[in-house]
Amino acid sequence: MDYIAEPATDMSHTSDWPLPADSLRLPIPAALLEKLAVHPLSRDLYPTSLGHYRRARDHRMSRERHDEHLLIYCSEGQGLLRVREGEAWREYRVGSGDLLWLPPGMAHDYAADDRQPWTIFWTHLRGDSATWLQHSAGYRDTPLRHWGLQHALLGGFEQLLEVRHSGYRFQHFLLAASRLRSLLCQLPLLRPLREGSLDLDGLHAYMREHLHARLELERLAAFCNLSKFHFVSRYKAITGRTPIQHFLHLKIEYACQLLDSSDQSVARVGQAVGYDDSYYFSRLFSKVMGLSPSAYRQRVRQGEGGA
């Protein structure tokens, strides 16, 4: 990997990596930051920008000066981090389940792997309690810890990102500051997952995030850092079904919600859960539910399927 590919920036500006449609970068306006910096519920810890980059090919950043805390949680793929320690640079390989915590003053650069680019959640943050939380979470002497793919972290970052729907209303950003505090306060209570262990909550959260997609077994196994054989074997031993069966059931469950609550056509519902072929979707739906999507919708609307 060619590492530093762009000039170092001053302070804690976010990267200008070209943002694809399925990724998010949300800088918080200065007027809101001024309010967060003085409000009694947020002044000691609040986000200044946040985002989610999916399979971020060619993503890289270099900062010589850094005046905020930065968290990066890798949920898929790989990357490389370098931090300056005195006159030397130390290098860290970053993988799925790693959480980076880069404090103010730590010169650093990082980049997604060329062949397996990372998927990351990230947030810049400020506040007097941030350093205390950093140390209590075990980051006093290292910028990287492996926690594994834990529901508490995946769900925590996803909750933070809900602020993008707020229309920049202050109360929503105050809630985001509270959620950030909750996320960081959980870290000392989490047990890092051992390499090769299986976190079902984290895996199922990943599945729910990709209900619109076709996730192959190889990708699910890679998400858990396991071979396909060991992944299926462990999953089936715990749940009694295969991971693909569970993913299919999650898709059908979501399709039922859409059929219940919207007037979308069966074809559109199928597309929403990753099936462009409406006939194939209908066959899968019928196999799981025992009736076609149209019959299911008619039954529910006639009052036969509700509480």
Curated annotation (Swiss-Prot):
Gene name per UniProt: mmsR
Lineage: superkingdom: Bacteria
InterPro entries: AraC-bd, Homeodomain-like_sf, HTH-like, HTH_AraC, HTH_AraC-typ_CS, Tscrpt_reg_AraC-type_HTH
PROSITE patterns for this protein: HTH_ARAC_FAMILY_1, HTH_ARAC_FAMILY_2
High-level lineage: Bacteria, Pseudomonadati, Pseudomonadota, Gammaproteobacteria, Pseudomonadales
SMART domains: HTH_ARAC
Disulfide bonds: none
Pfam family, one: HTH_18
Residues within the DNA-binding region(s): 218-239, 266-289
Metal-binding in keyword set: no
UniProt GO MF annotations: DNA-binding transcription factor activity; sequence-specific DNA binding
Keywords of this entry: Activator, DNA-binding, Transcription, Transcription regulation
Acyltransferase recorded as keyword: no
Role summary: Regulatory protein for the mmsAB operon. Activates the transcription of the mmsAB genes.
Biological process annotations from GO: positive regulation of amino acid biosynthetic process
Protein name in UniProt: MmsAB operon regulatory protein
Organism from which the protein derives: Pseudomonas aeruginosa (strain ATCC 15692 / DSM 22644 / CIP 104116 / JCM 14847 / LMG 12228 / 1C / PRS 101 / PAO1)
PANTHER family noted in UniProt: ARAC-FAMILY TRANSCRIPTIONAL REGULATOR, MMSAB OPERON REGULATORY PROTEIN
Domain annotation HTH araC/xylS-type: ranges: 201-299
